Amino acid sequence: LDIPLPPIEYLQRWGRPIAYDYIPKPFPLSAYQTVFARSAGSAEMPSAGRPFTRSLLACLRRSGVQLARLVLHTGVASLEQHEEPYEEWYEVPLRTAELVRATHARGGRVIAVGTTVVRALESSVDAAGNVIASRGWTDLVITPERRIRVVDGLLTGLHEPKATHLAMLEAIAGRNVIARAYAEALDREYLWHEFGD
């Protein structure tokens, strides 16, 4: 590929974020950045992190919530039934792995912000069931049949009814909880994707 600029610079100049039908006009690229963003590499915004602000993170810390960082380069969400999600690049640093292990050791809960975080943490488990520092591409597909080993809860947006991420939600919360949540979302006409409810 021969382009006149470095790839990231070229994409920043000419690329456009994925936009869904309910978005009336294009948003600036900055609207797609979460407070967690540190380096370029995602194909889509990790949308579960979008509602978080620096103020909210400070409030969570003051209330005793510990935050752990990792690197995620989200892929494009799969909308086709039975189509597996694309591989995604992740890095779980040693400090994060240690914090996850310490949280579980004291009986605490690990709550992931987004499905990509779940895939990253679950891909970083050793044979003994402990989270370790790791990085690479994950092609992990989590379903109710594939037991969750690390994550105790998940903050996420609404996923298309046939998306593979819906199976992950069922693995974490159970089919009945997800069915009730989606019934309410449809009844109240919640929005989906990056700027949804």
Identify the residue ranges that each predicted region occupies.
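Surface-exposed, charge/polar-rich loops and edge strands
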Residues: 1-197
